[in-house]
């Protein structure tokens, strides 16, 4: 069931969070250029900040959907050590999976490039395997698509950390079909925009026009990604609330 929400409040929070992370990360890395520890610290801090902003939006979407920016940001009051711990563990697990898939995919591409004479190896290594790994990563991510909504809704639970993670996974498994449909719909839109813009650029012969089109393309794609990601989060919150109250969509 679709519910009303205040798009402008969520959009402003996303922008504020993005700018905050960008400035903070650049400040930290500027203090110690090529310093692994500082870069790691920057990633850690920006990751925590991102989680706080996303948690605020998620909590607002299940408690005060039509609230102002301040109402959404006040949702940080529901953050506690257990919520942060669970969020941190899930984020680390997803990051490890993403890194493992990226690394293995890169190795496959490298091996394929090193053996271009074998067309079957090239196709599997350079094209098929990276796509398969990406799909696996996205499938795993879908099982935890409702983690922030669950944490915001059960911030005061007496369950242990691993028990909470288990319940989040079970909910993700139960809602997998709905999550997949929403993902295909709202991730497919940016992909179609991307493909359309890329194809249109192929028709342009003038180099100056190509530069102009490229700038328009980048801006248009970023705006599309921003809007669709917000709508996708809102639709996920609808699915979560429907599941919570036993509403059949």
Model feature map: region roles:
Residues 1-5, 47-124, 145-176, 232-249:
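Membrane-interface segments at transmembrane-helix boundaries
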Residues 6-30, 39-52, 86-101, 181-197:
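Hydrophobic alpha-helical transmembrane segments of multi-pass membrane transport/permease proteins
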Residues 10-11, 41-48, 83, 87, ...:
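Alpha-helical transmembrane segments
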Residues 11-12, 20-21, 35, 128, ...:
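Polar low-complexity intrinsically disordered regions enriched in Ser/Thr and small residues
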Residues 27-30, 45, 49-66, 136, ...:
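Juxtamembrane transition segments at transmembrane-helix termini in multipass membrane proteins
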Residues 32-42, 113-133, 207-220:
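Membrane-interface segments at the starts/ends of alpha-helical transmembrane spans
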Residues 33, 94, 106-110, 195, ...:
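Short, intrinsically disordered/low-complexity patches at protein termini
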